[in-house]
Regions:
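Short terminal alpha-helical segments
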Residues: 2-34
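Short acidic DE-rich linear segments
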Residues: 4, 100-105
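Generic detector of leucine side chains in alpha-helical contexts
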Residues: 6-7, 65, 89-93
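Acidic, low-complexity, intrinsically disordered interaction modules
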Residues: 28-88
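C-terminal non-catalytic accessory extensions
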Residues: 91-101
């Protein structure tokens, strides 16, 4: 399983990615409102930031899962899914995302 497949699996079986994107988007929009009018970002730039944060989020999940599964390029997708389901990781992920609070720096 690669990162794109993991993203697709999580997105199809959980609301974690959607909720994460919503939180990042809200945070970026709040930060954007505090910028000087001439320096405010357009919606496309905000969406690029949302995508960047989401890629990092999925990358971190992927790396941790790969270590836990002891995966390599030949590890079947089914082994990933079995591990995710047996350990109820999607429920844990949704709970973790619900508790995320982006703090002002």
């Amino acid at each position: 399983m690669n990162k794109e497949e993991l993203l697709e699996y999580i997105d199809n079986n959980s609301t974690a990615v959607t909720n994460f994107k919503d939180k990042v988007r809200a945070d970026q929009q709040a930060k954007n409102k505090k910028r000087q009018p001439a320096k405010r970002w357009n919606d496309a730039r905000i969406e690029r930031q949302v995508d960047k944060f989401t890629d990092q989020f999925i990358g971190n999940i992927y790396d941790k899962l790969a270590r836990a599964i002891k995966a390599n390029n030949h590890t079947p997708k089914e082994r990933w899914i079995k591990f995710i389901e047996e350990n109820e990781l999607l429920d844990d992920l949704e709970e973790s995302v619900s508790m995320i609070d982006f703090e002002e720096e």
